[in-house]
Amino acid sequence: MRRFFGTDGIRGVVNEDLTPELAYKLSRAIVGYFGNVKGKKVIIGSDTRNSKDMLKSALVAGFTSGGMNVLDVGVISTPALSYLVKNQDEVLLGVMISASHNPVEYNGIKIFKNDGFKLDDDVEAEIENYLLKEDNYYRANPREIGVIYDFSHIKEKYKNYLREIINGNFEGYKVMLDCAFGSLSEIAPEVFRELGAEVVAYNTKYNGLNINENCGAVYPETSKKLFLNSGAHIGFTYDGDGDRVIAFSENGEIIDGDIMLGILAKYLKEKGLLKGDKIVGTIMTNLGLEEYLKNINVELIRTKVGDRYVLDEILKYGLNLGGETSGHIILFDYMSTGDGLLTSLFLLKILKEKGVKLSELAKDIKIFPQVHEKVSVKGLNITEDMEKRFIEITEEVINGKNIRYIVRKSGTEPVVRITLEGDVPKEYLNELVLEIKSRIIDLLSNF
């Protein structure tokens, strides 16, 4: 069992789980794993949270002591960093400092290979082994210690790429953006404006402490209020590192990742561009989307929660579209990771091309009611037997009714997540999920 890497890199509460000492040891372990890194380049970027500088300094110390040069791109989205790592010459790795949608108390470290993909599980496990060993790894002589370069200018390369994909303009459209005080606070409004849209941007003045704070993709109902006051034709709300997006139709309907997947799948299929007539979702993907896809002769492949697992299935089957309910959408013809900005631009491109409103594209996708709860398990070792008991409790409460359930330990937070879904009133699902939560809490109180 891995101690540090979860489903999305290393993540935890800053100065408790994720310390500068750990960040330094990680970069030294990477030096140890890759061996001769003298003169190699690593791109480092971050979201806007205040702990970024502390963690970046620690990482830089480890890399430069091994002779690596650091290209500091500053505040950037995770997908933009992934793209730049792949498209910048002589780069060995990319490192993103971010805890994505989590509150400011958290931060994380994600590592990308120079092909733009996150590290494989087995490589992460090997790096953990190096991290746990005594640091006897290469240290450069004083004349060969690495240096830091300000490379914030290469973000323009990513912006240019997005404009090439859209290959048009959005003149006549008014767009609302909730940037969650995160990585897209500057670049998202810039790109939409450069493409001719009128932009109303909220939550862009970050201060290091307000990322994801009652805003962004984690709080769509709050964003919806901003949208309804904006007078915009369409709205998009992002998370802290810009790898997910939730949209709003012209009447304020929340368009989540499942509905966006349905819209994108139909568009690509109509164009003859949907590879394999299949898309990838997760165990959380709504049954309503699956029914819709069947009606347009598209197969849904389900996998574990996490965009890395969605990507694994895309690669396995040679597909080009996948995503999660939360708004991680992978348009694999263009990007190797979820990209909130690309997804929002692509949706607006479809609207303009078809000359319709977003509600018209979404109306045939009936999303079944779904409710979520979570139970804190911080400090507890959740065994397989305990997880089985959680499922038994859930089945006892559901009592044979036609309701789909998911009970799983989170890969990014110390919580157990409970999801119920069915073609029944949401109020009824809420009653059931709260009963399940209460029984699981009672069970955990004995440990």
Swiss-Prot record:
Q: Which residues carry this modification: Phosphoserine?
A: S100
Q: Does the keyword Hydrolase apply?
A: no
Recorded E.C. number(s)?
A: 5.4.2.10
Residues the record marks as active site = S100
Q: Which cofactor does it need?
A: Mg(2+)
Keywords, A to Z? Answer: Isomerase, Magnesium, Metal-binding, Phosphoprotein
* Any single GO BP term: carbohydrate metabolic process
Which InterPro entries does this chain map to? A-D-PHexomutase_a/b/a-I, A-D-PHexomutase_a/b/a-I/II/III, A-D-PHexomutase_a/b/a-II, A-D-PHexomutase_a/b/a-III, A-D-PHexomutase_C, A-D-PHexomutase_C_sf, A-D-PHexomutase_CS, Alpha-D-phosphohexomutase_SF
Residues that coordinate or bind Mg(2+): S100, D239, D241, D243
Q: What's the record's note on cofactor binding? A: Binds 1 Mg(2+) ion per subunit.
The UniProt transmembrane annotation reads: none
The terms under GO molecular function for this entry are:
magnesium ion binding; phosphoglucosamine mutase activity; phosphomannomutase activity
| Isomerase keyword on record | yes
The disulfide bonds in this chain are none
Catalysed reactions listed for this entry: alpha-D-glucosamine 1-phosphate = D-glucosamine 6-phosphate
Checking Gene3D superfamilies in the record gives: Alpha-D-Glucose-1,6-Bisphosphate, subunit A, domain 3, Alpha-D-phosphohexomutase, C-terminal domain
Which modifications occur after translation, per UniProt? Activated by phosphorylation.
Q: Which Gene Ontology CC terms are recorded?
A: cytosol
UniProt record similarity statement: Belongs to the phosphohexose mutase family.
- Supply the NCBIfam families for this chain: glmM
PANTHER family hit by this protein = PHOSPHOGLUCOMUTASE (ALPHA-D-GLUCOSE-1,6-BISPHOSPHATE-DEPENDENT) (PTHR42946:SF1), PHOSPHOHEXOSE MUTASE (PTHR42946)
Q: What does this protein do?
A: Catalyzes the conversion of glucosamine-6-phosphate to glucosamine-1-phosphate.
| Cross-referenced HAMAP family | GlmM_B
Spell out the protein name for this chain. Answer: Phosphoglucosamine mutase
Q: Which gene encodes it?
A: glmM
